[in-house]
Curated annotation (Swiss-Prot):
A lipid is attached at C18 (S-diacylglycerol cysteine). This is Nodulation protein T. GO terms for molecular function: efflux transmembrane transporter activity. GO terms for cellular component: plasma membrane. SUPFAM superfamilies: Outer membrane efflux proteins (OEP). Belongs to the outer membrane factor (OMF) (TC 1.B.17) family. It comes from Rhizobium leguminosarum bv. trifolii. It holds the Pfam family OEP. InterPro entries: OMF, OMP_efflux, RND_efflux_OM_lipoprot_NodT. The gene is nodT. Coiled coil: none annotated. Residues 1-17 form the signal peptide. The lineage of its organism: Bacteria, Pseudomonadati, Pseudomonadota, Alphaproteobacteria, Hyphomicrobiales.
Amino acid sequence: MRFTRYTTPFFSLLLSGCVVGPNYAPPEMPLPAKFSEGGVTSNGDVTVVAWWTAFNDPMLTSYVEQGISQNLDVQQAIERIDLAAANVTIAEASALPDLTLSGSHTVSGQKGKLRKQTYTSNTSTGELSLSWLLDFGVYKRNTESAEAALDAAYASVDMAKLAFINDIISSYVDARYYQRRLALSQANLKSRRETFELTKSKFAAGAVARMDVVRAEGLVQSTLAEIPSLDANFRISAHRIATLLGKPAGSMVEEIAKGSNQPAFRADVNVGIPADIIRNRPDIRKAERDLADSTAQIGVAEAKLFPSITLSGSISPSGGINERGVYGNLTPWSFGPKLKLPILDGGGLRADVDSAKSKATVSYLKWKSRVLNAIEQVENALVAMQREGRTVRALKREVEIAQETLRLSTSSYKDGASSLLDLLEAQRSLSVTQASLARAVQEWAKLYAVLNIAIGSGYNPVAKAGL
């Protein structure tokens, strides 16, 4: 065993500096200094910003906070972290010596009529085996690969959180939009029924023609026809919210129906600069970790082109007591290195290297594409949100004008100074404008969420040890 004591450090020293394959360096690419309609100041770490509180809607805030931990997609992503962590342990353990210990004890004997005497014997054996594979970096690169995959798993959790936040807010905004449309339709229905009754009274008095009564009733029926689909869409949105929170689809309809007005945010968004999204967006971080994983696999493939040495040895002491009570023992041992050298493989190992390099190139291109797409998403959301804000402000004024027009038309019709067509047109104009405003408020709120998601804001990452 003295030979083992001296040769193992020798081979370790021989191969410790022989790790093949490229050493990983994070990718870089030129980025614009600012977004086209943004500032030049970094927004820092926006991952912990609870930007949805700008809607000032306690119900929405509670749903987001509940779902970050309850959403099933998030829970699945968290569970995959355990798998990735186990793979790191496996990769690290593979680089260490394999030491096994075994032992046995046997009692044997003979008896019977054919034997003149009966006896038993006791035999004990044990074995201690050591095996250690030394190579050109397979285990080191495998460990690097597993660690990168673990980091990617953490990034996937953050991606799942952002996807949930976007889905829950979008579904909530939709539910409130349909709820608002229902309220508008019911108010319009009341107004049009009043007009219908007034027109019937005028017809009975001979002040208007039968055609006016038919037109007024037709408007009532068209309003009634809107309500069922609006109610169905509200319920569908409520079902989606419940599912996102890990609850049965129909369990939250009544709770959500008690909610308030359409969400309207009351805050500006500091989008920062393009360089910020590389740090803050988990999908970009995952793409970078995938690239690190692919780069490490090049080293794994290249290491298989070189020799590997396995150091192995064993000690197997055994002893026993025979039928006469005499004890004897034997201690065989063995040690020796084994060299494995690939010579002819038909080009398979070289092809593995080429394949690994190609996969790394694809990973880099995916990372670059992620960055460019992220910049585009921020630019698009920023422009769309700002323009939609102008639309909302204009529609609010248009609704005020339509309401005043309807008030004047109603008064004029009652006095007989204007026709029913003027009144019906005023009602229709107000209904259309109110619906347009509700749609614009819905879209504006969604764009606010889209912009915050695009800059990687709000997933509030937990320390790795806490997941």
